Amino acid sequence: MLLAMRLLDFLFAIRPLVLVPAWSFFLLGAAAAPDDSSRTWLRLALFTLAMIGVYLVNQIVDLESDRINDKGFFLQRGIFTPRQYAGAAVASLALALGVAAATENAPGLLAVAVGLGLAYSVPPVRLAARAGLDLGANAAGYGLLAPWLGAGAGTSAPGTAFLASTTLAVAAVFMHTTLLDLEGDRRTGKRTIGLVLGPGRSRALAALLAVLAAIAAIASADRDLGVAAGVLAVGSAAAAFRPARVSSRSVCVGGTAVYALAAAAAWPLFAAAVLALALATRIYYARRFGMRYPAL
């Protein structure tokens, strides 16, 4: 029973719901430029392993800011130690990159994604604490590299307009993400784009980025992408002009949801998987910590 609880704790310690945006953009890229299905699913598994490693490193570095922002549960409560996280991260990254190289399944692009993810978190580079570079790193990681990996990193990569739209969309949502973490970032010395611009200008920039994402999606002629980008543009504009009615959290949750639905339009089982994961997460956090998570 104790071992089962430890395994369950670790499953949720990697924050599986945080993987949903990465999966969504990966699958959108896979749908836009189909590759051999067996290689696509293997690449998704390797991408997931790599992102788990990156997220574990991020949690180690952000231990204190997550505590302040009330986002930490496992390191902060002593359920796991930073050393255990580090060991798991090394194993995940080594396995992902090793198998990608052995199977010649986009190893170079996966390595770039891992390098960017680590540069985002790890000092002295730590792009997460550098205003502007934090935005660029997130947009490039989720909006550019994830769909490109989904397509297989080959000559069948999604078109320029498609990748421009996904990159701009991620940037728009990220602007609101930084607003949710202002207090913790300020107290731990992180100089994020949200802190530098402030809430008003951050919301305005997010709206502009979302509108540009919608324009690029229309140019890409991808219907599902266009619908998702259009919804994000409307939500972002509403948050900019009526922030009291449309919160940054609503934009983050809604933006994640519409792109997950766009991915599910091409991969229907993805919707069922995300719903099952959300339900399992809600039950786990209620029973383990007595709290409501995820909360809308």
For the regions a language model picked out, list residue spans one by one.
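Multi-pass alpha-helical membrane architecture of UbiA-family
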Residues: 1-296
